[in-house]
Every structure is written in structure tokens, then in C-alpha cells.
Regions:
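Single, function-defining residue in the core of a domain
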Residues: 2-58, 99, 110, 136-405
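Short amphipathic alpha-helical segments
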Residues: 47, 61-62, 80, 84
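Nucleic-acid substrate recognition interfaces
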Residues: 54, 70, 89
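Short, charged amphipathic recognition helices of the HTH superfamily
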Residues: 56-66
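Short, basic interhelical loop/turn and adjoining N-cap
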Residues: 68-82
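Short active-site-adjacent helix-start/loop capping segments
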Residues: 73-74, 122-125, 190
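Active-site-proximal, Lys/Arg-enriched surface segment
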Residues: 78-138, 144, 149
């Protein structure tokens, strides 16, 4: 299997540093990454779309096309038509591009934490099932997704979810070990069994009214077993629901800042309960990435864009995933160079602007950025890319490992 390292995003020698992520740079990088596996014309079209997203104020077809046209110095209507044709191109198969994208993000990383969740686009009767890499910076990195009609979800949801796990398992390099996080809607026996069959670990929340049966045969609702003092407890070798589905362990906790208790089914039966809770708390990073993608005020505004066809949405989400990752990478350079301090309007030592939004800001500044700041930013960017082989190495969160106790 060909590996797709991150050094493709270094500028070629002789190119001006101010041309970072311009059309020539993005085209060359994507051709190098995907050109052997995909038709070259399609790769170039995808690169044009990514450049359009980087330069657009909104991820609508018209806005992306006009931004691309402005950069490519072509007629605006031509840019819009090119983007529209790309999104409708049945030759751009997500089953082909997603495995390549996953290889680019993960490379040879052996241990990953991923979150799975649905996100809705109600105005278009769409809902998208996503599997994202959980990271250290509060935003999950897109790995795989599939959009379906929300009105057809009834009685098919479980099938879609199991199929997604099956696909991702097939696309991942064999040596990658996965720990899956998911909310209450995913806490069912069929998923437990599939994850165990794939040798994936999991931390899946389930409802408080589900019965938990201990080894000694005592049975109670999960809500009854939650400690009142805010401590997390782990109960091993239990059975859940009235059907007595076996689960290696459950972790139960309700802390002061929690609206509801967390009842977590997990395969990590020897891991510390607090580590399980800490890992599950990272699940919310997928929702923050949804906001980056959908919110018209704080993100790319996909919620305001009407897309009737589910396949068009999935192709657009692929372009967004690339653009989002590049801007996040630039945001990492922002903090490494210390330039993030110039963006803060307070004295808080904590991050007040996401890496994605930092990257988006500095990307817009590149053409006219003052020289001393520009040199600091680009030096940090190049050092980060050279010191790491794969994108996921820079951002990933280490899953909880079973304790030795």
C-alpha cells in the first residue's frame, strides 16, 4: 500500500513562500498524492475546488466557483460551472478517494481514537454519518462520511452505521488499532459485536434506563448504579438490556458540571475509569468540527447552502475536509510561532481561537502580511511539516490503554 506523507505540502524549491496553498501548490500536492490512483483531470478539478474553498467566504457552489475564478483569472461563470460539474461527476467516487485520504491522514499511525456521529441538514432532508479522527486541539479530523436522505433513515439507521464501520475497517491499514467513541444512539448489541469482530476497542454511551446485570446476577438500571459523589466507577463483565448482551465493562459517572450521567459501555475493561471518561469527553470534538463546517458565523456556512443530491454533498465534504485540514495545519504553525498572541483580545493563557480559525485568518493575510510575521509563520510551518511524516501525527489524541493492574 502506497503511503501518502505530509511533506507533499511543502512548497517546491524556488517557489515564493507567499504562494502557500495557491492553485499551483495545491494542484501539485494533490497530483503527487492521488495522481497514481485517480484520473489526473479529476485530481486537478478537486484541487481547483479546494483552492476555491480556501478563498471563498461561504461554501456554496457559486461562492467557491467565483473564488476559484478570481484566483485562476477566468470568467466567473466558468469557475462556477467547473465546480458544479465536479460535484455532479459520478466518476469521483468516494469509495476511491476516502481510502486515499485516510492513508494521507493516518499513514503508519498504529493507535487512533475516532468518533462516529450523525449531523443533519434539515433544509435538504439530508443527514450525514461521519467517522472523524479525535485530536488534541478540540477539532476532529474528517476521515469518512456518507450522506443519506433523513426521511429514509427509519429502520435503516443501524444498517448504515454497521456498513460505515465495515467500510472504514476495510480502508484502514491493517496495523492501525481503533478505539471508537459514540453517543447514546449507537449503544446497541449489533455494534458491540461488530467492533469486537474487527478487534476495535470502544467507548459507547448508553441510556440511563438500560438495565445492567452484574456478575453476581444483581440487576439494576444504570441510573441507580451511578455514584452520587461524582466519582467514576467501573463494573466489569456485565450484561446490559433485558436481552443480557455481554459487555466487558461499564463506566458510570455524573459530575457537577454534567446535565446527565454518563453510562459508558467499553471494551477496555482494565483501563482506569477516569481515563475512559476523559477519552469519551473528546467525542465532543466531532461536534466542533461540524460547527466549523456548517456555521455561517463561525465556520464555512454549509448549513446555508442548499444541496439536493446526497452524492454532491459528500463530494463537497471531501473538498472541505482537505481545506479544513490545511487551515488547521497553518493554525498549528500560528501557535508554534507565537503569532496566536497577536490574535488574542485578552490575557488568557488558554486558546481563545481554534486552530482552524487561526489558520483561516493567516491564510487571508499571506499576500500582504508584514515580513517579520510572515517569516515566523512560514518557518514554523515548514519545521512542523518536516518533523512529522503524517498529518495525524501532529494532531491525534492517544487513546486510553488498558492498565497493567
Amino acid at each position: 500500500m502506497k503511503l501518502l506523507p505530509i511533506d507533499r505540502w511543502l512548497l517546491p524549491k524556488g517557489r515564493s513562500r507567499r504562494s502557500l496553498f495557491d492553485m499551483a501548490h495545491v494542484r501539485a500536492a494533490l497530483e503527487d498524492l492521488f495522481g497514481e490512483d485517480l484520473h489526473l483531470a479529476r485530481v486537478r478539478s478537486m484541487a481547483n475546488g479546494v483552492v476555491g474553498i480556501l478563498g471563498a467566504s461561504l461554501v456554496s457552489v457559486a461562492a467557491i466557483g467565483r473564488a476559484y475564478a478570481r484566483i485562476a483569472e477566468i470568467e466567473s461563470k466558468s469557475g462556477v460551472k467547473q465546480v458544479d460539474r465536479l460535484l455532479s461527476n459520478d466518476g469521483v467516487l468516494l469509495d476511491e478517494v476516502m481510502p486515499l485520504w485516510i492513508r494521507h491522514v493516518l499513514g503508519k499511525i498504529e493507535n487512533i481514537l475516532v468518533a462516529m456521529d450523525w449531523t443533519d441538514f434539515d433544509d435538504d432532508d439530508h443527514t450525514t454519518l461521519c467517522v472523524y479522527l479525535v485530536t488534541t486541539h478540540g477539532r476532529a479530523t474528517p476521515l469518512a462520511w456518507r450522506t443519506v436522505k433523513k426521511s429514509t433513515l427509519k429502520n435503516r439507521r443501524t444498517k448504515y452505521e454497521l456498513d460505515m464501520v465495515k467500510r472504514v475497517a476495510a480502508w484502514l491499514p491493517e496495523e492501525v488499532h481503533v478505539t471508537l467513541l459514540a453517543d447514546r444512539g449507537f449503544g446497541y448489541a449489533e455494534l458491540y459485536r461488530m467492533l469486537e469482530g474487527n478487534r476495535w476497542d470502544f467507548v459507547l454511551r448508553f441510556r440511563e434506563n438500560i438495565f445492567v446485570t452484574k456478575q453476581d446476577g444483581t440487576k439494576a438500571k444504570a441510573s441507580v448504579l451511578v455514584p452520587p459523589n461524582g466519582r467514576a466507577i467501573r463494573v466489569t463483565d456485565v450484561k446490559v438490556t433485558g436481552k443480557l448482551d455481554p459487555v466487558p465493562a461499564v463506566v458510570l459517572v455524573k459530575r457537577k458540571n454534567m446535565k446527565e450521567a454518563w453510562c459508558l459501555a467499553t471494551s477496555l475493561k482494565t483501563a482506569d475509569a477516569n481515563d475512559i471518561v476523559r477519552a469519551y469527553s473528546r467525542r465532543f470534538s466531532i461536534e466542533e468540527t461540524f460547527r466549523d463546517t456548517k456555521d455561517i458565523t463561525f465556520g464555512l456556512g454549509l448549513r446555508a447552502t442548499h444541496i439536493r443530491d446526497a452524492s454532491r454533498r459528500d463530494r463537497l465534504l471531501f473538498l472541505i475536509a482537505i481545506a479544513h485540514s490545511l487551515l488547521t495545519l497553518l493554525g498549528v504553525a500560528s501557535e508554534a510561532s507565537g503569532l496566536d498572541r497577536t490574535l488574542k483580545t485578552n490575557t488568557s493563557p488558554k486558546r481563545t481561537m481554534s486552530l482552524f480559525n487561526q489558520g483561516a485568518y493567516w491564510y487571508s493575510c499571506l499576500p500582504n502580511m508584514r515580513d517579520d510575521w510572515f517569516i515566523r509563520l512560514m518557518t514554523a510551518y515548514e519545521q512542523i511539516v518536516r518533523e512529522h511524516i503524517y498529518l495525524g501525527e501532529i494532531l491525534k489524541f492517544e487513546p486510553p490503554m488498558p492498565s497493567e493492574k
